[in-house]
């Protein structure tokens, strides 16, 4: 890996976590503000691009960059092939790599230490959290806004009925610590699908109750969340309380799912694993480019010799 120098300009806080993860690999990674934002170069050759915007489609800014350049790989946040037919993007359809919205508390807090045993065995006095944004800058509420608001109110009502729930937004550090005391979480997709919540819950061992995802929402490192393995699916917001009660009443099931979650994080989603995954995709793409160029040059030499 010493033969590669990677220059990137990940200009947004969404991608800061990926930059930090890449730097754990030991490869020569330079954050270069002099190249265009979101571009990825290997040995001074343009290889890839990262599309992090909150959209299942590519944005106008993405499309402009894609039209003006020939990226060989595009890392796409919020990739959802069952919602969007990506063949509309022509040559780029087979170059898109889904990568979800990944982050770790390690990037946010230098003092954070992930302790699997502690996370697995610690008391969790909070039954349910529903601390999620339910509106954005739009004046008109989207369907997801109403559902998220409904779930937040449901958590509040459960609190009034004797459950210990969290539903008010709080500061990031307080939220991080509170997740460690939380058993389950209500979450529903928004404009940007599930966003950061997935990794926040997985890293802290919180069991998501969410609408069905399946292969419609692949995360980075080829991770696909499975029902009753890593989370619990429910397609009816009106049934979330019943699902939570059933789950909380079954500690064996809770422990099984939590162990699966933490095993998944440890084996696929740590900083180092994610960094190596991104690096592998980038380097493999670069090597294919080099091989293709060698073949082109050989054909040219052959034609010139005839």
Language model regions located:
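A short, well-ordered alpha-helix in the C-terminal region of glycosyltransferases
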Residues: 253-268
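C-terminal "capping" alpha-helix adjacent to the active site of nucleotide-linked donor transferases
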Residues: 237-253
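Nucleotide-sugar donor-binding catalytic core of glycosyltransferases
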Residues: 1-227, 267, 272-276, 280, ...
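Catalytic phosphate/metal-binding cores of nucleic-acid and nucleotide-processing enzymes, i.e., regions
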Residues: 206, 216, 237-240, 261
């Amino acid at each position: 890996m010493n033969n590669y120098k990677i220059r990137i300009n990940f200009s947004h806080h969404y991608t800061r976590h990926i930059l930090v993860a890449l730097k754990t690999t030991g490869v020569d990674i330079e954050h270069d503000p002099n190249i265009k934002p979101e571009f990825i170069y290997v040995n001074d050759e343009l290889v890839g691009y990262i599309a992090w915007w909150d959209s299942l489609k590519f944005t106008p800014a993405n499309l402009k960059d894609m039209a003006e350049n020939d990226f060989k790989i595009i890392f796409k946040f919020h990739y959802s092939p069952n919602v969007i037919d990506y063949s509309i993007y022509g040559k780029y359809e087979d170059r898109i790599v889904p990568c979800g919205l990944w982050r770790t508390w390690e990037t946010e807090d230098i003092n954070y230490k992930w302790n699997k045993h502690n996370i697995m065995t610690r008391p969790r006095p909070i039954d349910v959290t529903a601390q999620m944004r339910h509106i954005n800058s739009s004046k008109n509420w989207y369907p997801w806004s109403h559902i998220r608001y409904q779930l937040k109110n449901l958590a509040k009502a459960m609190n009034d009925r004797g459950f210990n729930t969290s539903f008010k937004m709080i500061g990031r550090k307080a939220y991080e610590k509170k997740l460690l005391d939380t058993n389950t979480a209500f979450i529903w997709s928004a404009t940007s699908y599930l966003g950061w919540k997935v990794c926040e819950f997985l890293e802290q061992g919180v069991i998501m109750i969410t609408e069905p995802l399946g292969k419609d929402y692949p995360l980075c490192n080829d991770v696909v969340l499975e029902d009753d393995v890593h989370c619990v699916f429910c397609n009816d917001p009106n049934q979330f309380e019943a699902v939570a009660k059933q789950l909380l009443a079954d500690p064996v099931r809770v422990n099984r799912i939590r162990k699966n979650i933490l095993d998944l994080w440890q084996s696929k989603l740590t900083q180092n694993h994610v960094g190596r995954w991104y690096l592998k995709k980038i380097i493999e793409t670069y090597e294919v480019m080099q091989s293709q160029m060698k073949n082109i040059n050989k054909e040219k030499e052959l034609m010139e010799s005839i």
